[in-house]
């Protein structure tokens, strides 16, 4: 769909305008130590490879896409700091996460392009009504600075944030979104442990909004509103089957 609202909103989805094939690989180790109770920090490394082919005619003429090669390797180093009080990383029902990540990519590290990525994230979880009933709210922003390749631009619209949009449709140098989500599992903890089928089932409902812009400022006047519901089946503790609409 291109980069930025002006380009994205003008392009209709079709095989001849938006379809392309992306092959990618990423090695992203992070080394984290707890320096104080709930406070974690450490270095990280990112090596990622991306290749784009079967390019559609519209994409082949996109000026931002054509600034970069069709395949490249990016190599970056950085650090992270997190304050994490969640009672469970996979399926938390209480606590919070505050996270800040900074990464620097460069030709001097062996990569193809010079750019920086910054990320701030806030997650809060609160039990409501009864056990296995959780209210969660999330806010996140990513900022890219420098010569950020098209496939690495900050974006929203994926199974991990604002669900329902085509993956990677909304991308630019800066991205921000917020989500309010209610999660409900049927039955009690005791019924789940006893193997009761309905106690393994639940649902979610969410509302959210996101925007993009040219770094470091997002376009505060062009928010995309998002909402939906979903089914959850807990296959094992901390592991859910998800179906969202």
Predicted regions and their residues:
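Predominantly the C-terminal beta-signal and adjacent terminal strand-loop region
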Residues: 81, 222, 234-245
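C-terminal outer-membrane beta-barrel translocator/porin domains of Gram-negative envelope proteins
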Residues: 78-82, 86-197
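Flexible, surface-exposed loop regions and adjacent strand-edge segments
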Residues: 11-13, 57-64, 117-119, 152-160, ...
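Short sequence motifs at beta-strands and strand-loop junctions characteristic
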Residues: 19-23, 69-73, 90-92, 112-114, ...
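Outer-membrane beta-barrel transmembrane domain signature
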Residues: 50, 62-67, 75, 130-132, ...
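Transmembrane beta-barrel strands of outer-membrane/channel proteins
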Residues: 1-11, 43-49, 96-104, 120, ...
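Gram-negative/organellar outer-membrane beta-barrel architecture
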Residues: 1-73, 168-169, 240-245
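Transmembrane beta-barrel architecture of outer-membrane proteins
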Residues: 23-27, 47-51, 75, 104, ...
């Amino acid at each position: 769909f291109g980069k930025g609202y002006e380009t994205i909103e003008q392009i209709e989805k079709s095989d001849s305008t938006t379809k392309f094939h992306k092959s990618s690989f990423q090695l992203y180790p992070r080394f984290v130590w707890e320096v104080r109770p709930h406070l974690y920090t450490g270095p990280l490394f990112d090596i990622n490879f991306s290749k784009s082919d079967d390019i559609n005619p519209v994409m082949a003429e996109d000026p931002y896409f054509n600034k970069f090669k069709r395949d490249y390797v990016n190599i970056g180093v950085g650090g992270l700091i997190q304050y994490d009080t969640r009672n469970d990383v996979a399926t938390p029902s209480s606590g919070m996460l505050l996270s800040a990540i900074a990464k620097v990519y460069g030709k001097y590290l062996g990569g193809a392009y010079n750019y920086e990525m910054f990320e701030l994230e806030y997650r809060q979880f609160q039990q409501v009504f009864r056990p296995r009933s959780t209210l969660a709210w999330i806010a996140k922003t990513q900022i890219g600075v420098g010569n950020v390749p098209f496939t690495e631009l900050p974006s929203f619209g994926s199974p991990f944030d604002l669900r329902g949009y085509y993956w990677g449709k909304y991308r630019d140098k800066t991205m921000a979104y917020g989500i309010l989500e209610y999660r409900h599992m049927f039955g009690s903890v005791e019924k789940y442990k006893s193997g009761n089928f309905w106690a393994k089932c639940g649902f979610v409902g969410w509302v959210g909004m996101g925007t993009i812009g040219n770094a470091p400022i997002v376009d505060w006047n062009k928010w995309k509103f998002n909402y939906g519901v979903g089914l959850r089946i807990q296959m094992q503790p901390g592991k859910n089957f998800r179906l969202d609409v």
